[in-house]
From Swiss-Prot:
It comes from Idiomarina loihiensis (strain ATCC BAA-735 / DSM 15497 / L2-TR). This is Phosphoserine phosphatase. It catalyses: O-phospho-L-serine + H2O = L-serine + phosphate; O-phospho-D-serine + H2O = D-serine + phosphate. GO terms for molecular function: L-phosphoserine phosphatase activity; magnesium ion binding. Its EC number is 3.1.3.3. It is an enzyme of class 3 (hydrolase).
């Protein structure tokens, strides 16, 4: 019988949830058109992710932190998110979220799904408002790949028992670092390097990919 446990690392925006949080925040101060255009270019790999994030976050200056709640009540999960995580956890898998998005949202996703770990960018807040800056190092493509490897090491999970799921060009290195890389409703650049592609919004289809890879046979 195959070893049943492993590590699966998810992107957050447009993967576990069906929105791009930074774009939705930008709606709060009428900067959606500008910010979403930069997001699209970054996800296609046309501009550097860290540079794009700095540009986009600068557009959010002055937004009240309390107003973010309206974007996440309820949390906009993609279909099958909870069922997928529950199935994997029941099979002994570690589940993690590694996102170029923000801890304000990622921590809430972690709590709702009972994920084992979360890594994301932290928005700077002063006097209850966003400053337009990110605290600390930016979680970019390289950091995502490194975090997958570090989490696997932390839990003593063999490299050949690791899976990464994402949708954008900044997930490419993470998918390559994993034994199995799954592109979820992804941009063409990511689908081109992924082991499997799911072209629907139902996260439960990821189970089919894992069964094909034999990573979760015969547990689920």
């Amino acid at each position: 019988m195959k070893h049943s446990s492993g590590l699966i690392v998810f992107d957050m925006d447009s993967t576990l949830i069906h929105i791009e949080c930074i774009d939705e925040i930008a709606r709060l101060n009428n900067r959606y058109t500008k910010v979403s255009a930069i997001t699209e270019a970054a996800m296609r790999g046309e501009i550097d992710f860290a540079e794009s994030l700095t540009q986009r976050v600068a557009c959010l200056e002055g937004i009240k932190e309390s107003d973010l709640e309206s974007l996440f009540s309820p949390i906009p999960f993609n279909p099958g998110a909870k069922e997928l995580i529950q199935a994997l956890q029941a099979a002994g898998w570690k589940t993690a979220l590694v996102s170029g998005g923000f801890t304000w949202f990622a921590n809430r996703v972690q709590a709702a799904l009972n994920l084992d770990a979360v890594v994301a960018n932290q928005l700077e807040v002063a006097d209850g408002c966003l400053t337009g800056k990110v605290l600390g190092d930016i979680v970019d493509a390289q950091v995502k790949a490194e975090q997958l490897q570090q989490l696997a090491g932390h839990w003593n999970i063999p490299p050949d028992r690791t899976v990464a799921v994402g949708d954008g060009a900044n997930d490419g290195l993470m998918l390559k670092a994993a034994a199995v890389g799954i592109a979820f409703n992804a941009k063409p650049a990511l689908q081109a390097i992924a082991d499997y592609s799911v072209n629907s919004n139902n996260l439960l289809e990821i189970l089919g990919c894992l069964k094909q890879s034999e990573l979760i046979e015969p547990v689920i």
